[in-house]
Amino acid sequence: MKTFSLKPADVEKKWVIIDAEGLVVGRLASIVAMRLRGKHKPQYTPHVDCGDNVIVINADKVKFTGRKYDQKVYYHHTGFPGGIKERSAKYILEGRFPERVVEKAVERMLPRGPLFRRILGNLRVYKGSEHPHAAQQPETLDVAALNRKNVSA
């Protein structure tokens, strides 16, 4: 039996929608990253973008376990000497762009490289329950039903 290698022309991409309300950030990000890469498919090929298009709604209503909501710190650098900045998860989730928490969590679970940028383009995160992708007829994925630990009380 020969090793199967998927060609980019043979890729069948589906649209998947995930409601992030009440879900634990890391567990959600892990499932989304696997879907984006296509590792849930039997014809997965590492060097081909064979994953699905993923829409995450209600990203502002995600949960952290333990005391991470107050204590988790996100760092970024301005590019100037001594320009390291930090923000807590609470500050970001209550701020103007709360969807960045989910975006960063997923982004940091994907391998770097040229394919990374293409895969990340298949992720759409929205802070409310509205999204402009109804025409794609996305299939709902119930992450909460996959494992009871995926939902925080």
Curated annotation (Swiss-Prot):
PANTHER family per the UniProt record, alphabetical: LARGE RIBOSOMAL SUBUNIT PROTEIN UL13M (PTHR11545:SF2), RIBOSOMAL PROTEIN L13 (PTHR11545)
Family: Belongs to the universal ribosomal protein uL13 family.
Source organism, top-level taxon: Bacteria
Name assigned to this protein: Large ribosomal subunit protein uL13
Pfam families reported for this sequence: Ribosomal_L13
GO terms for biological process, alphabetical: negative regulation of translation; translation
Record InterPro entries: Ribosomal_uL13, Ribosomal_uL13_bac-type, Ribosomal_uL13_sf
General function of this protein: This protein is one of the early assembly proteins of the 50S ribosomal subunit, although it is not seen to bind rRNA by itself. It is important during the early stages of 50S assembly.
Lineage: Bacteria, Pseudomonadati, Pseudomonadota, Alphaproteobacteria, Hyphomicrobiales
GO molecular function per UniProt: mRNA binding; structural constituent of ribosome
Assembly and oligomerization: Part of the 50S ribosomal subunit.
Gene (UniProt): rplM
Keyword Ribonucleoprotein set for record: yes
GO cellular component terms listed in the entry, alphabetical order: cytosolic large ribosomal subunit
Cleavable signal peptide: none
Record keywords, A-Z: Ribonucleoprotein, Ribosomal protein
